[in-house]
Each structure stands twice: as structure tokens, then as C-alpha cells.
């Protein structure tokens, strides 16, 4: 199945993307090749092949919910450049520099 450059431009516009003409041509060619490869899967004979939903045999692995000793706060804050009231202080990211 051939993906046209017009289709690439249409999807790009919907996605609010812009591409040069050479990029549009490259995408159209590449996407056409990808679709052709996927269409080859329709030709594979899967008669008698069991449906596969997952390749992993693992089920949910549960563990006991047991409280454990945490890491020492002093050790956690050892390399923190700035702290305030037991919290790591970071530069303000809001325009006004105020509290969040």
C-alpha cells in the first residue's frame, strides 16, 4: 500500500507538525515500506496455531507487606546542597518565584 505525500502532509497537519518537502517524501516512502511489511503478515498461514496472549509465564508476584527500616535521613541528606525543614530545597520554577 502506497502512502502518498499528501497523506503525510494531512497527518502532519492534524498532529501540528511541519516537515520539509524532502522529509515528507522520505516519510511517505518509509511509511509505505512499513505498511507493506505489515501486510505480509496477512499471508502467513496461522491455521492450527494457538492464540498467544503473552509470552511471559509469570503471574503477579506478591510479597508480604511488612514494614522495614528505612534509610537514615542524615545519610539521605548528606549530598543535598540545600534543605529546609527536612525537605530538599530546589530553585523556584514558577514565574513569580512564589510557593506552589
From Swiss-Prot:
Keyword Protein biosynthesis: yes
Catalytic activity: L-glutamyl-tRNA(Gln) + L-glutamine + ATP + H2O = L-glutaminyl-tRNA(Gln) + L-glutamate + ADP + phosphate + H(+); L-aspartyl-tRNA(Asn) + L-glutamine + ATP + H2O = L-asparaginyl-tRNA(Asn) + L-glutamate + ADP + phosphate + 2 H(+)
EC annotation from Swiss-Prot or TrEMBL: 6.3.5.-
GO biological process: glutaminyl-tRNAGln biosynthesis via transamidation; regulation of translational fidelity; translation
Cross-referenced Pfam families: GatC (PF02686)
GO MF annotation terms: asparaginyl-tRNA synthase (glutamine-hydrolyzing) activity; ATP binding; glutaminyl-tRNA synthase (glutamine-hydrolyzing) activity
Keywords, sorted A to Z: ATP-binding, Ligase, Nucleotide-binding, Protein biosynthesis
InterPro entries given in the database record: Asp/Glu-ADT_sf_sub_c, GatC
Source organism, top-level taxon: Bacteria
Recorded family membership: Belongs to the GatC family.
Assembly description: Heterotrimer of A, B and C subunits.
Known function: Allows the formation of correctly charged Asn-tRNA(Asn) or Gln-tRNA(Gln) through the transamidation of misacylated Asp-tRNA(Asn) or Glu-tRNA(Gln) in organisms which lack either or both of asparaginyl-tRNA or glutaminyl-tRNA synthetases. The reaction takes place in the presence of glutamine and ATP through an activated phospho-Asp-tRNA(Asn) or phospho-Glu-tRNA(Gln).
Name used for this protein in its record: Aspartyl/glutamyl-tRNA(Asn/Gln) amidotransferase subunit C
Organism: Streptococcus pyogenes serotype M49 (strain NZ131)
Amino acid at each position: 500500500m502506497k502512502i502518498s505525500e499528501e497523506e503525510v502532509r494531512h497527518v502532519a497537519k492534524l498532529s501540528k507538525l511541519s516537515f520539509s518537502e524532502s522529509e515528507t517524501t522520505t516519510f511517505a516512502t518509509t511509511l509505505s515500506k512499513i505498511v507493506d511489511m505489515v501486510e505480509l503478515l496477512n499471508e502467513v498461514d496461522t491455521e492450527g496455531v494457538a492464540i498467544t496472549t503473552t509470552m511471559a509465564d509469570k503471574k503477579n508476584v506478591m510479597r508480604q507487606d511488612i514494614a522495614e527500616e528505612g534509610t537514615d535521613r542524615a545519610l539521605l541528606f548528606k549530598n543535598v546542597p540545600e534543605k529546609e525543614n527536612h525537605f530538599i530545597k530546589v530553585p523556584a520554577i514558577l514565574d513569580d518565584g512564589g510557593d506552589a
